């Protein structure tokens, strides 16, 4: 994957979005913290400086060393990057009279500029800054303005350096992707050769060379990431890949056997381990959400360790790590504060001494799905909604019992099958049911009931970082609510969660 684009991260919430837009142009890019610029820049064809919550005037402002970049390769500075270049090149940056946040329009665009080829007149852009450039460096030329921002875009004479005070990566910037394409393809001449087919060919060759005849073990979850990783590894090393699919007793209804059969039908060397009783036994009496997660993580490691020891001469542990996980681990400020323990289980015992292989570590989730399609994986598997590693345990509020698991599996099954039959499943990013720790009074026939309450949750999102609740049709909600109450013994009330993230999280625990 040569001819990369290097994106320097200054802590902006939009940095990953820049990378996604660049990847959409079939151009490979990588994100690095501004203070960890690679020493060898020979494989990079262009550099993008991202935005930042900091002010260039602040004492704690990021100050990257751009001596190996400025004037030596094409450079695009976005928002904070544009202000940084202006500030340290002799221009003036000052606090704006009002915070410039939201939509704006380019009222002036300099004619004949390649950067703005194909960009519509009065094009809408997205602003997000509290400082503004008041004067350009003497060697800079204004390229664009808005009503409130005179220097919305500029370039440095004698360099292939461009700077913009808005965010082209945000969807609200209607021609933003076109501007990125103009800079990367027409100005920087970066090849557009990063495609799913190219990735598969290159990664399979890399895995063959790295792994040789070594044996590799991989824990399958039934999710998209581990499934695509397994098929990719299987294509490279065949039966030297040993897959372990553990049933923790907290999967969806009939999921363990159904997914196991699918894996075997795909030709994977997979072993199913039904450890449901062991997990539920360890979870008995535990109500605290974090303790549940850690207990499930610990027991999974124990089960995986037991099964791995039955294999001889395994040297590698494969994981379905994807790029957002990698970026988070080396971010400007380090990993975010722990809101919840991460679903992905790590921390295998040191004595296992396995080397790690992560074939998907440079891909975003949507790219993983496209690679999966290229590999011929069943669209039903690729289109599965995200499902938490701890399974239904964090959708059962309070302690966990086999009876509660059974109820929630049945409710979830009615909900998910209903979404599919109404043609709604693929329009929803994630959906599921939550068993609440309360009973409610009801009437069935002439009998008074006092039974469980369940909540239904359906959200739309692109990456899970933010999410909006889905406005499911009232007729559907009425039908699925009636079906749940009539078909699932022990439930007499259904509610629908209309909270967005933030402030709520997608899962209740």
Curated annotation (Swiss-Prot):
Residues 4-193 form the Glutamine amidotransferase type-1 domain. It is an enzyme of class 6 (ligase). Its EC number is 6.3.5.2. Keywords: ATP-binding, Glutamine amidotransferase, GMP biosynthesis, Ligase, Nucleotide-binding, Purine biosynthesis. It comes from the Bacteria. One of its GO terms (molecular function) is GMP synthase activity. ATP binds at residues 221-227. It holds the Pfam family GATase. The keyword ATP-binding applies. The active site is at 79 (nucleophile), 167, 169. One of its GO terms (cellular component) is cytosol. Coiled coil: none annotated. It catalyses: XMP + L-glutamine + ATP + H2O = GMP + L-glutamate + AMP + diphosphate + 2 H(+). The keyword DNA repair does not apply. Residues 194-384 form the GMPS ATP-PPase domain. Pathway: Purine metabolism; GMP biosynthesis; GMP from XMP (L-Gln route): step 1/1. InterPro entries: Class_I_gatase-like, GATASE, GMP_synth_C, GMP_synth_GATase, GMP_synthase, GMPS_ATP_PPase_dom, NAD/GMP_synthase, Rossmann-like_a/b/a_fold. PANTHER family: GMP SYNTHASE [GLUTAMINE-HYDROLYZING], GMP SYNTHASE-RELATED. NCBIfam families: guaA_Cterm, guaA_Nterm, PRK00074.1. Homodimer. Catalyzes the synthesis of GMP from XMP. HAMAP family: GMP_synthase. This is GMP synthase [glutamine-hydrolyzing]. It comes from Flavobacterium johnsoniae (strain ATCC 17061 / DSM 2064 / JCM 8514 / BCRC 14874 / CCUG 350202 / NBRC 14942 / NCIMB 11054 / UW101) (Cytophaga johnsonae).
